[in-house]
């Protein structure tokens, strides 16, 4: 088994130590990753399962060290910029005390999920909130007469453009973008829009995460493993998880995934789960063959996918009963998350 030379990170340190522009630091980091890390991933694919476990751990450690070196230099550049400003201006004049808030629960959950998938080497994508009918509907096997296409459900800009109704629109574009690769691992996040009346549990704008993982031999076992791992990471290891058969045009088979309700243990009536003892948290499934075909993905590959409403997860994790509080600049709510990251 190849031994990783952790000492060669000094090469990157020497390259970036005198750089004064943040973008140039990232450029040097990317070159280093291509020259030193990418070849190791190719070697990993050829190893036995036993060797892969140990070598994979070393690879992740190596990658984190590379990222840390780059981020350290970036922080030094930012700090120097502040010092330069201080030398030109007197920024120490007295000012009124401003009470600070904290990070919005939506961002807290999003950051948790992104961190989870970054560790699994997923590409993290965001796109314009305006997308095409093709990527939002056509390429995702959504029929012309599907109710979601109706102007009563979707915010159209013109005949060909709209505000995306799900982040699967980014996924469909990513599948086409990376269709020459043997493995595609993509996570997208951002706002989505639907013509819902705003109330305690609905909003015309909300945040969504969409995941797709394509490679040879992907199955329901992979989907269940990844979904279970994510939900236990977000909530706790003891939660119960249930899969129900459902239908989505872009997956086959499709499932809705529930977790056991942790609000109603001591209540006669639970307003969260309506006494069903279960709470729906995401939709998932195997990518429909037509979706892969429309993206010209290599033959012989299969994929798993799921979509998660970030707002819903935030409401469950932090026991927020009205979704409007997440968007209403409610300082008392945001202040309670001071110190969270």
From Swiss-Prot:
Pfam families in alphabetical order: Phe_tRNA-synt_N (PF02912), tRNA-synt_2d (PF01409)
Primary location group: cytoplasm
Note on how the cofactor is bound: Binds 2 magnesium ions per tetramer.
Class in the EC hierarchy, top level: ligase
Keywords noted in UniProt: Aminoacyl-tRNA synthetase, ATP-binding, Cytoplasm, Ligase, Magnesium, Metal-binding, Nucleotide-binding, Protein biosynthesis
Residue ranges crossing the lipid bilayer per the database entry: none
An example molecular function term from Gene Ontology annotations: tRNA binding
Superkingdom of source: Bacteria
A GO CC term assigned to this protein in UniProt: cytoplasm
GO biological process, one term: phenylalanyl-tRNA aminoacylation
Known cofactor(s): Mg(2+)
Reaction catalysed by this enzyme: tRNA(Phe) + L-phenylalanine + ATP = L-phenylalanyl-tRNA(Phe) + AMP + diphosphate + H(+)
Protein residues bound to Mg(2+): 252
UniProt family annotation: Belongs to the class-II aminoacyl-tRNA synthetase family. Phe-tRNA synthetase alpha subunit type 1 subfamily.
Subunit annotation: Tetramer of two alpha and two beta subunits.
Protein name, UniProt field: Phenylalanine--tRNA ligase alpha subunit
Organism annotation: Malacoplasma penetrans (strain HF-2) (Mycoplasma penetrans)
């Amino acid at each position: 088994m190849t031994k990783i030379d952790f000492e060669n990170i000094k090469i990157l340190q020497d390259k970036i130590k005198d750089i004064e522009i943040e973008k140039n630091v990232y450029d040097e980091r990317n070159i280093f990753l291509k020259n030193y890390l990418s070849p190791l991933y190719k070697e990993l694919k050829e190893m036995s399962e036993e060797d892969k476990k140990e070598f994979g751990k070393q690879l992740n450690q190596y990658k984190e060290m590379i990222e840390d070196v780059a981020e350290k230099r970036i922080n030094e550049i930012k700090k120097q910029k502040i010092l330069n400003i201080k030398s030109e201006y007197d920024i120490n004049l007295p000012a009124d005390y401003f009470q600070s808030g904290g990070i919005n629960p939506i961002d807290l959950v999003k950051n948790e999920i992104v961190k989870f998938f970054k560790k699994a080497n997923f590409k993290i994508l965001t796109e314009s909130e305006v997308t095409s009918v093709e990527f939002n509907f056509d390429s995702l096997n959504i029929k012309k007469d599907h109710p979601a296409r109706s102007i009563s459900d979707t915010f159209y800009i013109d005949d060909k453009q709209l505000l995306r109704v799900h982040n699967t629109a980014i996924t469909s574009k990513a599948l086409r973008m990376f269709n020459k690769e043997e493995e595609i691992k993509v996570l997208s996040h951002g706002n989505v829009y639907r013509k819902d009346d705003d109330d305690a549990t609905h909003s015309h704008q909300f945040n969504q995460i969409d995941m797709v993982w394509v490679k040879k031999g992907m199955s329901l076992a992979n989907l269940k493993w990844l979904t279970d791992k994510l939900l236990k990471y977000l909530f706790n290891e003891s939660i119960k998880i249930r899969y129900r058969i459902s239908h989505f045009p872009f997956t086959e088979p499709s499932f809705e995934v529930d977790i056991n309700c942790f609000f109603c243990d001591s209540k006669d009536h639970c307003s969260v789960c309506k006494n069903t003892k279960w709470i729906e948290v995401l939709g998932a499934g195997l990518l429909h063959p037509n979706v892969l075909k429309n993206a010209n993905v290599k033959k012989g590959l299969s994929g798993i996918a799921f979509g998660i409403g970030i707002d819903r997860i935030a409401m469950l994790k932090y026991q927020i009963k009205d979704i409007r509080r997440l968007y209403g600049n409610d300082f008392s709510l945001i202040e309670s998350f001071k110190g969270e990251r």
